[in-house]
Amino acid sequence: GVVDILKGAAKDLAGHLATKVMNKL
């Protein structure tokens, strides 16, 4: 459903941001 799609997008975004932060450290 829509909620599942939003949850998946949020996880992808969080993972992407975490990767960016780790690369800067």
UniProtKB/Swiss-Prot annotation:
Expressed by the skin glands. The modification Leucine amide is found at residue 25. Keywords: Amidation, Amphibian defense peptide, Antibiotic, Antimicrobial, Immunity, Innate immunity, Secreted. The keyword Secreted applies. GO terms for cellular component: extracellular region. It is found in: Secreted. GO terms for biological process: defense response to bacterium; innate immune response; symbiont-mediated hemolysis of host erythrocyte. The keyword Secreted applies. Antimicrobial peptide with activity against Gram-negative bacteria but without activity against Gram-positive bacteria. Shows a low activity in stimulating insulin release from rat BRIN-BD11 beta cells, and acts without loss of integrity of the plasma membrane. Has very low hemolytic activity. Shows weak amphipathicity in its alpha-helical conformation. Belongs to the frog skin active peptide (FSAP) family. Ocellatin subfamily. This is Ocellatin-L1.
